[in-house]
């Protein structure tokens, strides 16, 4: 292992030896791993561009998911022959994804019965896939979100798994953890989803939390079993840190001037996304003052954040082409990295490696100080993202600000201020607003998303802010119930300015199903109703229940220099 430069020994000491060991393990593994599947835009070359630009399908994801019927090289050689017709050519040479059968729930089902009945409907098995398929095989069955999302998605799955656990389907939780561990072992990280075109990026890192969830059922055995994969994922997120100088960024790692290590979202490619090809090209063309590759990278990195798209990443909330995701240090990502470090410490201790546990604790403590120093806006009184270009914390309040509370990284006095800010600026009749900005993007007002409702609810409860937490749950559940009563389905996102309406905006129509909404709804139903009187629907009047969640003892914020 290369020795650190003499000017950096103290800072490098904060990085556990396991990171370097994991890098070595990954490099050895890379020699044994099959060639990484190529995404369709590379496999098909100019043909892919021609088909997407011709807009043969209403959704660009359709052709990205189409399976070539023979070697793509042979298919490409047949293009533009005499009498060539592009639509006919595609129909002959590709198998298009099948539209999912519309699920019609039995009459008279309660909300809980509907969700429990959906788990098998949303379950898929793909142990084997066609040779040229963009779908990546997984060894165990998994639950998909629903609608156009025919594959498993990384961060969606954690909130889906909360619901599976609530329904008693611990076998499915275990299967999905095993699948994600398989992806880490196979590709070195968990991709955005199990598609070849998602391999160049990940998503909010919830794998360690998934293992922690499974450990609620299986005990420390789960932590010990998946410790190697958690370490490998940590190595992926910290890749490049060993050579990073102060003030530099490398892939997903940021080193600030004082040596603080934080993370950002990143995609290894800088081309249009195959699943949104035409849209990305149009976005890049609309801003000739920026290199197209830079815009493509920032679009892809926003997809890696899960928030695609939001004013959070933009200089001008009304212009998507001003997004610059890679120059923003997100508060939610770094909260999740803190949690990953804490769980790695716990798992290392369970495995009997106290020295390694102490190293991860040291890393977590250093990151917590970084969050308090760089991701807190003292003037506004809330957590926010850090801007690498202006070298300042940003002013915008978003629902991501509640992640430090969710992972118990916030100081008590700051959590109290967050509760006030949440109630004043984000709480709406139908739940928690994603932001207070109306940009037309789906991760902005007036949309509310199930995972953010749960993060806020749990986070506020961790700090004894039960009233605001229960307000969020009650408002969101009412929204879900009213929509279900009218449409007999749960949807991907909701308009929280009212109740009973699905959300809008973004690149595609509103999707139903819907994995993470199902999971969060079950958790919230069991939160608001007393255990001795569980509810199958949201009650007409708010129950006077007491949560079993106890606030975690917190310390006051340390003054930042």
UniProtKB/Swiss-Prot annotation:
Lineage: Bacteria, Pseudomonadati, Pseudomonadota, Gammaproteobacteria, Enterobacterales
InterPro entries from the UniProt entry: 6-hairpin_glycosidase_sf, 6hp_glycosidase-like_sf, Glyco_hydro_37, Glyco_hydro_37_CS, Trehalase_periplasmic
Catalytic residues, chain numbering: 308, 492
Similarity comment: family membership: Belongs to the glycosyl hydrolase 37 family.
GO-annotated molecular function: alpha,alpha-trehalase activity
Assembly: Monomer.
Signal peptide: 1-30
E.C. number: 3.2.1.28
This protein's UniProt keywords: Glycosidase, Hydrolase, Periplasm, Signal
Region (Disordered): 535-561
PANTHER family found in the cross-reference section: TREHALASE (PTHR23403:SF1)
Role, per record: Provides the cells with the ability to utilize trehalose at high osmolarity by splitting it into glucose molecules that can subsequently be taken up by the phosphotransferase-mediated uptake system.
Gene name of the encoded protein: treA
Record's protein name: Putative periplasmic trehalase
């Amino acid at each position: 292992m290369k020795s650190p430069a003499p000017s950096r020994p103290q800072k490098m000491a904060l990085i556990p030896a396991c990171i370097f060991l994991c890098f070595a393990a990954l490099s050895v593994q890379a020699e044994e791993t099959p060639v990484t599947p190529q995404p369709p835009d590379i496999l098909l070359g100019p043909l892919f561009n021609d088909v997407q630009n011709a807009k043969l399908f209403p959704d660009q994801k359709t052709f990205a998911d189409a399976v070539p019927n023979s070697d793509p090289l042979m298919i490409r050689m047949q293009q533009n022959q005499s009498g060539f017709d592009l639509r006919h050519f595609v129909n002959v040479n590709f198998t298009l994804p099948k539209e999912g059968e519309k699920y019609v729930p039995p009459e008279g089902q309660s909300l809980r019965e509907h969700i429990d009945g959906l788990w098998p409907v949303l379950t898929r098995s793909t142990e084997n896939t066609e040779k040229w398929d963009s779908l990546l095989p997984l060894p165990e069955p998994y639950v998909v979100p629903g609608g156009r999302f025919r594959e498993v998605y990384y961060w969606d799955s954690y909130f889906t798994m909360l619901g599976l656990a609530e329904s008693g389907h611990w076998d499915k939780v275990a299967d999905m953890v095993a699948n994600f561990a398989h992806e880490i072992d196979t590709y070195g990280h968990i991709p955005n989803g199990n598609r070849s075109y998602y391999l160049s990026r990940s998503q909010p890192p919830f794998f360690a939390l998934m293992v922690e969830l499974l450990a609620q059922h299986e005990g420390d055995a789960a932590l010990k079993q998946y410790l190697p994969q958690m370490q490998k994922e940590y190595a992926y997120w910290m890749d490049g840190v060993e050579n990073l100088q102060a003030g530099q960024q490398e892939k997903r790692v940021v080193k600030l001037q004082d040596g603080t290590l934080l993370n950002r979202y990143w995609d290894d490619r800088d081309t249009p996304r195959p699943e949104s090809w035409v849209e990305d090209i149009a976005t890049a063309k609309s801003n000739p003052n920026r290199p197209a590759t830079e815009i493509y990278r920032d679009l892809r990195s926003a997809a890696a954040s899960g928030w695609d798209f939001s004013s959070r990443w933009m200089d001008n909330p009304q212009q998507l082409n001003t997004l610059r995701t890679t120059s923003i240090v997100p508060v939610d990502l770094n909260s999740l990295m803190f949690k990953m470090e804490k769980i790695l410490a716990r798992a290392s201790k369970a495995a009997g490696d106290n020295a390694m546990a102490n190293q991860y604790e040291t890393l977590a403590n250093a990151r917590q100080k970084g969050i308090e120093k760089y991701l807190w806006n003292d003037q506004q009184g809330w957590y926010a993202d850090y801007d690498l270009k202006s070298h300042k914390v940003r002013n915008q309040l978003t629902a991501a600000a509640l992640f430090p509370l969710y992972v118990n990284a916030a100081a008590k006095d700051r959590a109290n201020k967050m509760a006030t800010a949440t109630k004043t600026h984000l709480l709406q009749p139908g739940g928690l607003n994603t932001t207070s900005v109306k940009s037309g993007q789906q991760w902005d007002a007036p949309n509310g998303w199930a995972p953010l409702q749960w993060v806020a609810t749990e986070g506020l409860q961790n700090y004894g802010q039960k009233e605001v937490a229960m307000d969020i749950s009650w408002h969101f559940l009412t929204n879900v119930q009213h929509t279900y009563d009218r449409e007999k389905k749960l949807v991907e996102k909701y308009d929280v300015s009212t109740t009973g309406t699905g959300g809008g905006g973004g690149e595609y129509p509103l999707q139903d199903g819907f994995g993470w909404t199902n999971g969060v709804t079950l958790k919230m139903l069991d939160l608001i109703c007393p255990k001795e009187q569980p509810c199958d629907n949201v009650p007409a009047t708010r129950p006077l229940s007491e949560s079993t969640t106890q606030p975690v003892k917190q310390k006051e914020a340390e003054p930042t220099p």
